[in-house]
Amino acid sequence: MVLLVRHGLTALTGPVLSGWTPGVHLDDRGQAQAAALAARLRDLPLTAVISSPLERCRETAEAIMAGRDGTPSHVDERFGEVHYGDWTGEKLETLAKDPLWPVVQAHPSGVRFPGAEGESMPGAQHRAVSAVRDWNARLGDDAIYLVCSHGDIIKAIVADALGLHLDQFQRIQAAPASLSAIRYTGLRPFVVRTNDVGGGIDGLLPPPDTESAPGAGNGAGKADETGSRHTGGDGDAPVGGGA
């Protein structure tokens, strides 16, 4: 299972599109959010913690790592923010007047951000989803690992897991310091949580008997004899499998 965490608040969150601007750190609010999230997840065993290279994510990840001696930590640029090109560092109220803005909102699959370093939204989604798939393979089916990333990247990963076209990814929210969880299986991904800013870890822990939990999926049990995991977990209600 992958836990997708958006970084905590910064002084620029909201009014400015920070993008890859260096030196954007968590403010006091963001530090408090990161500490609160770390406390919520304290009893959840993590196989690894992986972060975007940007400071606001690394600081959030470091707060979660505090007290987790022996848990490996990594930085993966593929979980970095979208490369917004010439939009980087601009105020959102200014960008909202740009002719490209409504296209970003309604048709992001057709968007490439302006400037030599501007990235396409499909390209950003592809690198992020590929990174998740690579880490799934590297860490194994029963891993529970955390990725600290950015709003648009998290929304793009969740949209892919839900089978949504990228043009619908703006329907998904990823608030600062929120948690989204996806269990990947041989059959399909199961989106366990989205934009969770206050829930406990019930439902994220693997069941006590992981060996006998067919259908428990990545981070929660072994595959059954067919090699696939059929449900989203004990609380799921698949067709023909409960009400």
For the regions a protein language model found, what residue spans apply to each?
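Acidic, low-complexity terminal tails and accessory targeting/binding regions
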Residues: 1, 84-93, 137, 141, ...
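Generic beta-sheet signal
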Residues: 2, 143-149
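Loop-to-helix element that buttresses phosphate recognition and phosphoryl-transfer chemistry
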Residues: 3, 9-64, 114-129
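Active-site metal-binding loops of divalent metal-dependent hydrolases
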Residues: 8, 151, 196-197
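Glycine-rich phosphate-binding loop signature in dinucleotide/nucleotide-binding domains
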Residues: 42-45, 135-143
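Active-site signature of alpha/beta-hydrolase-fold catalytic machinery across serine-
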Residues: 63, 156, 160
